[in-house]
């Protein structure tokens, strides 16, 4: 009856739509939120069952059928609905033979040093949960600690990080809970304008000390430390100060004294012929550091290079604390080092990275034909292909051509194009260029042809659109045209015969675009 309808209706409404209204979900969610409607699916299933009973009654009433035959016919007919759904979408949901979540999570952990209880900073779901699964369920690399920077802004998560977990000791955080409890030190302003006054204060104190009066110098060093811009002193005398007026960072260029012996013992690659006395951390462009960033500085200061600290390659620059110029890549991770790797021109530890990629990494079955790879897994496949291309280029620069060729061939074997198509943005172009540099023009040409054909296909498709669709797709056309043009330049650079085929297409397609674009502009003015 109508009463039962309203019971099911409100179950349907309150377990789905009402939850979304209550949570006030913002538009453009990072992923589909189907699980918010899980309860509604149960309620709708009740309606489906009631609907089947209703169809049976209709057959009894209008077709004058008995209950059992009517029920049998309706049941068989209704079975075609899930069968049809399964036949059309089974392949989109079939994960059999695919273990990328587990294996790629292990690859992050295998990119860490095997000793020293390393720390890895992550940020998003897809570079955190697979690591947690491997550590919590598989018992893999329980000596390492995964630290999610998104959660590090909260007091409860810092509490967790200060406790040991499995074979990993607590993270090197010395702050008392009252210093990071919610509402405290949520952010600390960066005030480089203070530097002038502080420099003047130290200069005056040193001047008095030269005259025999050392009291002022003793007091100022007692207040702000030997060097007020050194990381440990900033943490101690400014950020953690009891004086609220001093809870600032008085410079946008922090220095950190380097324990050279600890660096030598750490196991990190030492580029160049010396270890710097100080590490420089630039905060230029930042007006404040948030709690998670303060914790990163605290751990860097307290670890003192004795505990390896890494950050996942999937963490964006906005969460790297402007320290990208101190990173050395060892796989799917960047390692924090005291070196300015930009100035030294060394961004990759090729020996460690080669060992990790060639001997330790797993690929979750993506080398097998027919494996279904959704967009999330595909992004990680792209990341793996990119790091292979980066490794190959570094090995070529170091003159290790045999290893570079082996790395490229292994990437082709484990990340094949039939499952992970070549694309301008996923490292395929860099791999093709590396093959050219290694003298394997046949393989390079094969890759470049696929890439160029893909660009031509897109450009031809845009030109086939009607005027309305074409006018809103001009930016995409220009992107793919720029891609094709760049690919042709690479072909010409390495004297590939493919240039003779695709160079005319670059000009031809652009002329067609320019003519049509100009015509549309004139039509708009009219």
Where are these regions (language model features)?
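ER/secretory pathway lumenal C-terminal domains and tails of membrane proteins involved
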Residues: 1-37, 44-117, 129-526
């Amino acid at each position: 009856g109508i009463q039962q309808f309203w019971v099911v209706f409100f179950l349907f409404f309150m377990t789905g739509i009402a939850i979304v209204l209550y949570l006030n979900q913002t538009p453009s969610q990072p992923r589909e939120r189907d699980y918010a409607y899980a309860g509604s699916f149960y309620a709708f299933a009740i309606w489906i069952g009631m609907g089947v009973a209703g169809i049976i009654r209709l057959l009894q009433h209008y077709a004058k059928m008995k209950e059992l035959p009517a029920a049998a016919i309706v049941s068989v007919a209704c079975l075609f609905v899930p069968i049809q759904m399964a036949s059309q979408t089974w392949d989109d949901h079939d994960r059999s033979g695919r273990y990328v979540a587990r294996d790629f999570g292990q690859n992050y952990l295998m990119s860490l040093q095997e000793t020293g209880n390393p720390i890895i900073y992550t940020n998003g779901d897809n570079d955190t949960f697979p690591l947690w699964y491997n550590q919590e369920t598989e018992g893999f690399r329980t000596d390492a600690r995964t630290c999610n920077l998104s959660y590090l802004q909260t007091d409860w998560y810092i509490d967790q990080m200060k406790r040991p977990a499995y074979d990993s000791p607590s993270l090197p955080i010395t702050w008392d809970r009252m210093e990071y409890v919610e509402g405290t030190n949520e952010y600390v302003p960066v005030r480089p304008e203070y530097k002038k006054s502080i420099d003047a204060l130290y200069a005056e104190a040193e001047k008095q000390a030269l005259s025999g009066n050392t009291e002022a110098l003793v007091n100022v060093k007692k207040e702000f430390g030997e060097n007020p811009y050194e990381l440990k002193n900033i943490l101690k005398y400014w950020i953690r100060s009891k004086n609220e007026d001093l809870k600032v960072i008085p410079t946008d260029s922090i220095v950190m004294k380097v324990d050279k012996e600890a660096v030598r013992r750490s196991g990190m690659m030492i580029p160049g012929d010396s270890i710097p006395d100080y590490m420089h951390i630039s905060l230029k462009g930042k007006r404040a550091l948030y709690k998670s960033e303060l914790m990163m500085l605290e751990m860097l200061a307290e670890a003192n290079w004795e505990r390896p600290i890494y950050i996942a390659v999937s963490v964006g620059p906005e969460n790297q604390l402007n320290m990208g110029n101190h990173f050395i890549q060892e796989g799917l991770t960047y390692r924090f080092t005291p070196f300015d790797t930009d100035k030294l021109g060394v961004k990759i530890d090729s020996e460690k990275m080669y060992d990790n990629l060639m001997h330790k990494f797993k690929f979750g079955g993506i080398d097998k034909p027919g494996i279904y790879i959704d967009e999330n897994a595909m992004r990680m496949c792209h990341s793996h292909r990119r790091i292979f291309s980066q490794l190959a280029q570094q090995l070529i620069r170091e003159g290790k051509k045999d290893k570079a060729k082996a790395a490229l061939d292994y990437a082709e074997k484990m990340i094949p194009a039939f499952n992970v198509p070549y694309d301008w943005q996923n490292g395929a172009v860099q791999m093709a260029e590396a093959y050219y540099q290694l003298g394997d023009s046949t393989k390079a040409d094969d890759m470049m042809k696929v890439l160029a054909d893909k660009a031509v296909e897109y450009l031809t498709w845009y030109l086939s659109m009607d005027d309305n669709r074409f006018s809103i797709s001009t930016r995409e056309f220009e992107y793919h045209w720029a891609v094709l043009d760049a690919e042709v330049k690479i072909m010409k650079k390495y004297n590939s015969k493919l240039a003779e085929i695709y160079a005319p297409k670059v000009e031809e397609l652009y002329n067609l675009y320019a003519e049509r674009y100009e015509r549309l502009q004139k039509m708009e003015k009219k």
